A protein has these predicted regions:
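Small-residue-rich helix-loop
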Residues: 3-105
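Short helix-capping/linker segments at secondary-structure and domain boundaries
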Residues: 1-2, 43-45, 122-129
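Metal- and O2-centered redox machinery and metal/ROS homeostasis
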Residues: 155
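Charged substrate- and nucleic-acid-binding regions of tRNA-handling and nucleotidyl-transfer enzymes
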Residues: 92-152
Length: 155
């Protein structure tokens, strides 16, 4: 298995080919473990890593049509508010806050997880949701959830 520094150097040109100039090396190192096992080539890794670097993430039209629907808008906005003050910003803490919020609001994981995934990644398939949030960081996670809430609501 290629060591992380070598992999980072090798995948960077493929990210540039996707229009992502000079990807942040620290962000790349943080995101890499979440996509590396599934990527068979550096090009596949660059595709899998794309949404960690692109603002806003490219939306898969089918995923958006299926999951960013009007009913999802309020939930995504409320989720953004519920996560905005999480500290420390780690996957386990985010999951705990998310599940507490679900219980408090009477929502089901199935109602919110896929719309949140599409909001954060632009796709219906990704690494675990809380890992994605942890790598994206609080500002981008909350901003993407709010943008998707507005989109889902038709605004």
């Amino acid at each position: 298995l290629t060591d992380t520094d070598t992999y980072v150097t090798a995948v960077a040109p493929f990210l540039r080919d996707r229009g992502l100039a000079a990807p942040d090396a620290d962000l790349l190192r943080a995101a890499l473990p979440h996509v590396r096992a599934r990527a068979r080539t550096y090009a596949e890794a660059a595709f899998a890593l794309d949404y960690f670097f692109r603002e806003p993430p490219e939306l898969d039209a089918q995923a958006a049509a299926r999951f960013l629907v009007p009913d999802a808008g309020p939930a995504l906005g409320e989720l953004a508010d519920a996560l905005a003050d999480v500290t420390p910003w780690r996957a386990d803490v985010l999951e705990e806050r998310f599940r507490t919020w679900l219980e408090r609001t009477g929502r089901d994981l199935k109602q919110v997880a896929q719309p949140a995934r599409v909001a954060l990644t632009g796709r219906s398939a990704s690494p675990p949701l809380f890992d994605v949030m942890a790598v994206l960081g609080p500002a981008r996670t909350v901003a993407r959830l709010r943008a998707a809430a507005a989109m889902a609501a038709g605004g």
